From Swiss-Prot:
The modification Phosphoserine is found at residue 21. Citrate synthase is found in nearly all cells capable of oxidative metabolism. Pfam families: Citrate_synt. Induction: Expression is repressed in medium containing both glucose and glutamate. Expression is up-regulated by the presence of C2-compounds such as acetate. Interacts with F-box protein UCC1. Peroxisomal citrate synthase involved in the citrate homeostasis. Catalyzes the condensation of acetyl coenzyme A and oxaloacetate to form citrate. Citrate synthase is the rate-limiting enzyme of the tricarboxylic acid (TCA) cycle. Pathway: Carbohydrate metabolism; tricarboxylic acid cycle; isocitrate from oxaloacetate: step 1/2. It comes from Saccharomyces cerevisiae (strain ATCC 204508 / S288c). Belongs to the citrate synthase family. Keywords: Cytoplasm, Isopeptide bond, Peroxisome, Phosphoprotein, Transferase, Tricarboxylic acid cycle, Ubl conjugation. GO terms for cellular component: cytoplasm; mitochondrial matrix; mitochondrion; peroxisome. This is Citrate synthase, peroxisomal. Disruption phenotype: Leads to glutamate auxotrophy and poor growth on rich medium containing lactate, a nonfermentable carbon source, when CIT1 is also deleted.
Length: 460
């Protein structure tokens, strides 16, 4: 069977060779960094391992373990004021500091992956070679192509995404090497290769799902000279350079968000059992598919369209305010507003807002989002039931995708999954490099907790 988009990969190896430089590759640089980091971790735990770092409340245990420090995640930390920081850098920092494609104003997600893994900003040449390396790995095995082609079109795109990634387990270099008895010191190297193989294949998988479910099933070819986001957009079926630039921004700002969210934690948990990157990421994608995690931007759009129909295009302050109060008084929330940690407007929202203002300030849905932004924080503050009345990233992302013709909101979580893979896989490589332990927290029954609480309270 001939698959058109696979043919171009024969050209990628020659592209890599002709564009190679004396600068270190990502794997070479990581191999220099991780032994130092691993030793630092060992020494830190040795010296301070008995230090108590937190008290846990019963309500936290029953409240989804919210706020309990119980995991290590190197790539990002969420600051209540500055928002997400990638290796210490804010959204504004990475937009300024990370390499960009020629003529683009947005950072390349490949550059962020380098930053997440090493803590360093790569050079332009290093990122271009990483882009080419990823695209050289994009070819799907025939059984995965056939599998996707045979899935029913009404099967949710996220289910198809997870199935395809799981089926790629057949290609796992780590699983094969582990079965042959490799040394623990080599775990990270095979995990690295699997992770880059998987990252390279994700745009093809995502685009194939989109073309199969929503279009005619036909796809173009991977372009070895194009960056990651451009290949993704082109394979989906668009040649709009502004859409490509949006996708660079989208993939970058959605790539990592600490390790406690469902997709990151699930992948970390499964990976701690030494499951391959394919199985680890697939588990996270299944978590991301849950409506409480990855469906938020789709729910925002559904709510916006309902609002738009209700107000008959009257976006005045009074009309918007009334609709917001009606939403809250009916026991519902305003989707896209509020955050568990942030106490100000999500910088990711602001980055997307600026993109919209620069490219389509008169787009009707954007004007509606802007009107809500002017009114909602005041309404939520007066309502008094949220600690953060400001918009988060989900309040905006779906509107931008709508503008560029990607109308099928059930596909949006697939794009979220492609993006989140950068952060998840960077941490998995790091976990294998430092010899992270398998997760095994303690659980109790409610009766046992009652007993514990009774004993504690009797001593007060």
């Amino acid at each position: 069977m001939t698959v058109p988009y696979l043919n171009s990969n024969r050209n990628v190896a020659s592209y890599l060779q002709s564009n190679s430089s004396q600068e270190k590759t990502l794997k070479e640089r990581f191999s220099e960094i991780y032994p130092i980091h691993a030793q630092d971790v060992r020494q830190f735990v040795k010296e301070h391992g008995k230090t108590k770092i937190s008290d846990v409340l019963l309500e936290q245990v029953y409240g989804g373990m919210r706020g309990i420090p119980g995991s290590v995640w190197e790539g990002s930390v969420l600051d209540p004021e500055d928002g997400i920081r990638f290796r210490g850098r804010t959204i504004a920092d990475i937009q300024k500091d990370l390499p960009k494609a020629k003529g683009s104003s947005q950072p390349l997600p490949e550059a962020l992956f380098w930053l997440l893994l090493t803590g360093e900003v790569p050079t332009q040449a290093q990122v271009e070679n990483l882009s080419a390396d990823l695209m050289s790995r994009s070819e799907l095995p025939s059984h995965v192509v056939q599998l996707l082609d045979n899935l029913p079109k009404d099967l949710h795109p996220m289910a198809q995404f997870s199935i395809a990634v799981t089926a790629l387990e057949s290609e796992s270099k780590f699983a094969k090497a582990y079965a042959q008895g490799i040394s623990k010191q080599d775990y990270w190297s095979y995990t690295f290769e699997d992770s880059l193989d998987l990252l390279g294949k994700l745009p093809v998988i995502a685009a194939k799902i989109y073309r199969n479910v929503f279009k005619d099933g036909k796809m173009g070819e991977v372009d070895p000279n194009a960056d990651y986001a451009k290949n993704l957009v082109n394979l989906i079926g668009s040649k709009d350079e502004d859409f490509v630039d949006l996708m660079r921004l989208y993939l970058t700002i959605h790539s990592d968000h600490e390790g406690g969210n469902v997709s990151a934690h699930t992948s970390h948990l499964v990976g701690s059992a030494l499951s391959s990157p394919y199985l680890s990421l697939a588990s996270g994608l299944n978590g991301l598919a849950g409506p409480l995690h990855g469906r938020a931007n789709q729910e925002v759009l559904e709510w916006l369209f309902a609002l738009k129909e209700e107000v008959n295009d009257d976006y005045s302050k009074d009309t918007i305010e009334k609709y917001l109060w009606d939403t809250l008084n009916s026991g519902r929330v305003i989707p896209g507003y509020g955050h568990a940690v942030l106490r100000k407007t999500d910088p990711r929202y602001m980055a997307q807002r600026k993109f919209a203002m620069d490219h389509f300030p008169d787009y009707e849905l954007f004007k509606l989002v802007s009107s809500i932004y002017e009114v909602a924080p005041g309404v939520l503050t007066e309502h008094g039931k949220t600690k953060n009345p400001w918009p988060n990233v989900d309040a905006h992302s779906g509107v931008l995708l709508q503008y560029y013709g990607l109308k099928e909101s059930s596909f949006y979580t697939v794009l979220f999954g492609v993006s989140r893979a950068f952060g998840i896989l960077a941490q998995l490589i790091t976990d294998r490099a430092i010899g992270a332990s398998i997760e095994r927290p303690k659980s109790y029954s409610t009766e046992k907790y009652k007993e514990l609480v009774k004993n504690i309270e009797s001593k007060l």
